[in-house]
Amino acid sequence: MRWHHLPMLLILITAAVIAVGGTIRIYDAGESCPDWPLCFGKLGFDVSADEQAAWWAENPDEIDSRGENHRYTTFQIFTEWFHRLLAGSILGPLVILQFLIVRKKNPSLSIESKRLATLSLALVIWQGFIGFVTVKWDNEHWSVALHLFSALIFTLSLIALDISWRRDRGHNLKIETVNKTMNRLSIATVGSLVVLLVGTFVSTTEGANQACGVSGIPYSWPLCSGTLGLFIQDLLIQSQAIHRWLVLIVLCILAWLWWTRFDWAPDERIRKLSNIATWTFISNMALGAAYVITWTSESGFIEWLSVIHLLLASLTFLIFSSSLILIHLHGINNNEEE
């Protein structure tokens, strides 16, 4: 078997785990398995309303945040169960297998690849722990944000291993850089991450997605309740206004980076990756606007737009971060003075 394809397979599985996690959020199913690692004390997901009531009666300290009489549908429980199945029963064992293969079966691999395999194993264990914390803390904003951040860092460890493994097999890219290259990409990476994490608070805080109103253009977008959204009284409830201002700031930074791209990115491949990430960011801005302005009194928000919004935001961060990894592993600095 061509084991060097394993990191890419794990990246795809991780993307599926993140997507299912987003689905859990839009269906309000984050607490549909109140215990961990089981679901209402069962291995399966088919838990009736009566069985849920019996479990709550036996576990009075685990009251659902929506009240003791709240019940979940089979589909809601399935989304959380499937999320755990992908992460714990498929992704986790494959990461362990990858670690064993890299450490024991491939002596020709570099020490860097072996360290990355170890890091990915440590991170998937950490991610499982954070998943447990998220359940125990009833999907608090900070725990959900930390869970997503950890998933992205884990994904980056797999991307880095994939690139390093390919380099060990002779795929040397020789990417030209200058002293400005890492600096500029780091700014874009941090900016996209901050926007993503604040967006997580918007999506997990009750009422935050309506904090700027639902009256369409221009009252609710691009304005925030008919104002510029500068007066902040409640950081969580008004996180949408903060999110929008951060998006605008990062957009200006990305426009500046695009305008000066030949100054800081001599390698065409890095410029292309930066351009792809920038256009992904801009497209996601439009998607975020569409999410707000398509609200109706009959059906509310189109929540699938929210999931795609999350995935595109994650993709933007991962593309910028992957550019940094490529430069770290394949970069050739021309030693230009800034």
Language model segments and positions:
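Polytopic transmembrane helical bundles with strong interfacial aromatic enrichment
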Residues: 1-338
